[in-house]
A protein has these predicted regions:
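Cleavable N-terminal signal peptides of Sec/SRP-targeted secreted and luminal proteins
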Residues: 2-17
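N-terminus-centered regions that define maturation/targeting leaders and the start
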Residues: 13-209
Length: 209
């Protein structure tokens, strides 16, 4: 199904609201599934998404206020250069956590033969008193700015937060030199013992006009 950018923008505007509760995030995912099947998340990444905390993803904006995305919000590509910062609210512990970001729509939502693209993978995140996550080690995969190709519909970019298991720093399935294409977050999570994500959010980014 081909969806115009204008239609996607209208739906994205409908879900721009303060993510004040887990129910708000789950409702955004659910509403996206009802109205735009292309935006449904858990089925496309084969992972059980039943969050118990809130993940906030904030992009710096030179000369302007940072943008904290709300589940389902569409951002201009030039607002996603990043790297973003992460915060968590409602988590049972202060970490450590693993953060992952994937694009299940590459090269296009209708023909995602390169999906998933791994846009970020990092561990050893711990929360300070305000919930802001800090990381003292290099990411496994540094943040890659969304770059959907010309002519594509908007892509979904999904951010997931996991509790970090012991031994995660010793995993070798994904390294800084591993291809970012055809990544499978569900398979990776199972292989390294991440379990299911405890929080998540997503945004839409369309090609530059």
């Amino acid at each position: 199904m081909h969806l115009s950018l204008g239609f996607l923008s209208l739906i994205a505007l409908a879900v721009i609201a303060q993510d004040t509760s887990i129910a708000t995030v789950k409702r955004a995912f659910s509403n996206a599934n009802v109205w735009i099947p292309l935006i449904y998340i858990p089925e496309d990444i084969s992972i059980n998404f039943n969050p118990t905390a809130l993940l906030e993803v904030t992009f710096p904006e030179p000369g302007a206020r940072p943008i904290t995305i709300h589940a389902g919000q569409q951002l201009p590509r030039n607002s996603t250069a990043g790297p973003p910062s992460f915060s968590v609210r409602g988590a049972a512990s202060r970490g450590p956590f693993v953060v992952a970001a994937v694009d299940p729509d590459a090269p296009t939502p209708q023909d995602p033969t390169s999906a998933e693209i791994r846009h970020f993978l990092g561990g050893n995140f711990v929360s300070d008193g305000s919930g802001l996550l800090h990381n003292g080690t290099a990411a496994v995969s540094e943040f890659l700015q969304p770059t959907p190709p010309a002519g594509s519909d908007a892509h979904r970019y999904i951010f997931l937060l996991f509790n970090q298991p012991r031994g995660f720093n010793d995993q070798t399935l994904v390294t800084p030199t591993t291809s970012i294409s055809n990544f499978d977050i569900a398979t990776f999570a199972k292989a390294v013992g991440l379990g299911n994500p405890i929080a998540g959010t997503f945004m839409l980014v369309a090609p530059d006009s």
